[in-house]
Amino acid sequence: MSHRHQLKAALLVALLAFMGMAFSSAAQTNASPRQPLRLEEVLGSITNQYPPLLAALIERDITAGRLKSAQGTFDFNTFARVFGMPAGYYETATVDTGFEQFLGLWGSTVFGGYRITGGDLLPDYDKTRTQGGGELRFGLKVPLLRDGSIDRRRAAVLKAGLDKELADPVIARQQLDFIRAGTVGYVNWLGAGERWRLAERLLSIANDRHNAISNQVQAGLVGRIVLTDNLRLVVSREIFLVQAQRRFEAAALALSLFYRNTSDEPVIAARERLPDTFPMMTAPDGIQLDRDLQLAVAKRPEVRQIRLALDKLEVDRRLAQNQMLPNLDVGAFASQNFGKDRYPDLNEFELQLGVEFRMPLQRREARGRLTELEGQIQQVTNQERFARNRIHTEVRDTFSALLAAHQQIQQAQLNVELAEELRSAEEEKFRRGGSDLLPLQLREQAAFDAQLLTVEARTEYLRALADYRAATATDLAARGPLPAR
């Protein structure tokens, strides 16, 4: 029976060693020099190499492309055409070139061109005829009411510009989420590593005692059942060690999604890169909470995102209000012929002025659009107010969680001190023969559980700190602007 248990224990230890060697080899393949891995290194990797964040940065290029496309409404347009009658009573050919430029200044448009007609003399009613040197023309059209202060083309440019600004808070929101997730991944890796260390220490205690009990059994001081009981304890602690190692490996793999090398490949952080201790954990400052409540609304990207959405709706509302007005357009057109006088009626400088008025009587399209936009603006305004309330709530809630986590650390440390005192007393009593193995095992397990609670309390504090920093958008200001893609 004892030999069978010893064989199982040996196999379990061999399996554990093989798993550790395999994982360590994979980690060594990817890891950087054996310096402790710090959170700042992980966050730097997220900022510069995390694929989802790099993909989010492309939104800047997308919105810049949309803005440039919208600005195409201000492109300088030119045209050229040739037409004629090669056969017929009048054999003529005409070359006509011109340009048109939308200025954007109160919706005005300038246009002009040059035309020349050659061939047989044309009758007076032919509008394409020119003198021998051709005709220069120039014109201007200005909308006085509708499409004056704003029109669909200028509204599209304004909204595309706002979309370009909107890319930054959208990216910043994702950056906050990625930083928080990467921080939690790092904290879980720290906690899993500390659990692994504790499991090894607990197993080492049982192994050392196993050797001592074996000597006592051989000397006839204790029964073999005591050795069997301790062997059972060794096996159970080896099982826990395997579980702790697997937990660490899972945490390292999860962290590797955020932590990458210069080739943008995931790095599996080896156990050797674990820091000796957890980061310093200070008590939350209630005065800082008051400051953070004020700053969070200003720094959180959701508020700016909603404000920009409101600005876009305001552009649409301005356009809808303008579309309620009638069309009242004025224009001027001037032309002058040059060269050989073939037509006596085309010698003079010509200037044409005109006014055009148009208006749909019901104006239902503009009225309906205006009603729709006013409703949407009210919706987004309510969303903005709720977003501010939610930000305040999140900051207070995460601060409360941070405060509770810090208090748990203090209580957990006291729990460890008391459990260690009891374990030490029970161990001394066992050495003197005043106690058997079972009470000592219970004291050791209680001390181990207390240490695990401390690890959990510390990791919970760091997770709560990550939540608080995300709620207050602290990492956005701390890390500065994102790099260009």
Predicted regions and their residues:
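A short glycine-centered flexible hinge/capping loop motif at secondary-structure junctions
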Residues: 217-224, 430-434, 471
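Periplasmic alpha-helical coiled-coil/stalk elements that build and connect Gram-negative outer-membrane
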Residues: 2, 9, 168-292, 401, ...
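Sec/SRP-type N-terminal targeting helices
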Residues: 54-58, 62, 71-72, 104-133, ...
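N-terminal cofactor/phosphate-binding cores enriched in small/glycine residues
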Residues: 35-87, 91, 98-101
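Amphipathic alpha-helical coiled-coil scaffold segments and their short linker/junction regions
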Residues: 46-47, 222, 226-227, 261-330, ...
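Gram-negative outer-membrane assembly/targeting C-terminal domains
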Residues: 28, 463-485
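Bacterial N-terminal signal peptides
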Residues: 10-22
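Small/polar, glycine/serine/threonine/aspartate-rich low-complexity segments that form flexible
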Residues: 29-34, 79-142, 273-286, 317-318, ...
